[in-house]
Structures are given as structure tokens and as C-alpha cells.
Amino acid sequence: MTNRMELSGTIAKPPIRSKSPGGIEHCRFWLEHRSTVIEADLPRQVYCRMPVVVSGLRSQAITQNLVQGSNIKVSGFVAYQTGRNGVGKLVLHADNITQI
């Protein structure tokens, strides 16, 4: 099975940094993506907003320059996460972030 995603866009809200009770660093933010793709030989406008999380020892190093409005390319894996309110969503767990 393959679970790999790459998405570019703009950081829509200021990143939130936190530490879990186990001492693991996390950085969370929303990535807003807009593009045009060809589907069925026709151009289609694409828009999505996806939550991104970066965890672990590298999180501080790869997120230290991120601010709201930064244009970035993110790669990682996607996982389903259920919030405290019971609503589920897909989250991109990033292992690489590049400023563009």
C-alpha cells in the first residue's frame, strides 16, 4: 500500500506549536491550495484547505520560518483524525516542507 501526498499552497492561519504530554513537539497549520487541472479534457479549478501537522525532533527545524501567508510545498502521508467534537478529517502529516 502507498500513502504519499505532495501539496503546495499558502499557510492560511498562523502555525500553532505545542508539546504532547510525552514531550513530542508538534506544529499544526492549515494549507490552502488553488490550482487548475485538466479533467475530461476540460480545465477545472481546484480548491482545498487541508490541516497539516509536523511532529517530532525535526518539527522545530523545518517549521521555524513558517508564518501565515508563506507559500510552501509539503510532502508526507495522510491519516484520518477524529476531533474532540467527533468530526473526522484527513490530516497531512508532513515530513518535508519547502518554501516556494
Swiss-Prot record:
GO cellular component: primosome complex
Record bears the keyword Nucleotidyltransferase: no
GO biological process: DNA replication, synthesis of primer
Stored InterPro entries: NA-bd_OB-fold, Primosome_PriB/ssb, Prisomal_replication_PriB
Gene3D superfamilies for the chain: Nucleic acid-binding proteins
UniProt keyword Flavoprotein, yes or no: no
GO molecular function terms noted in the UniProt entry: single-stranded DNA binding
Function: Involved in the restart of stalled replication forks, which reloads the replicative helicase on sites other than the origin of replication; the PriA-PriB pathway is the major replication restart pathway. During primosome assembly it facilitates complex formation between PriA and DnaT on DNA; stabilizes PriA on DNA. Stimulates the DNA unwinding activity of PriA helicase.
Subunit structure: Homodimer. Interacts with PriA and DnaT. Component of the replication restart primosome. Primosome assembly occurs via a 'hand-off' mechanism. PriA binds to replication forks, subsequently PriB then DnaT bind; DnaT then displaces ssDNA to generate the helicase loading substrate.
Family: Belongs to the PriB family.
Name the record gives this protein: Replication restart protein PriB
Organism: Vibrio parahaemolyticus serotype O3:K6 (strain RIMD 2210633)
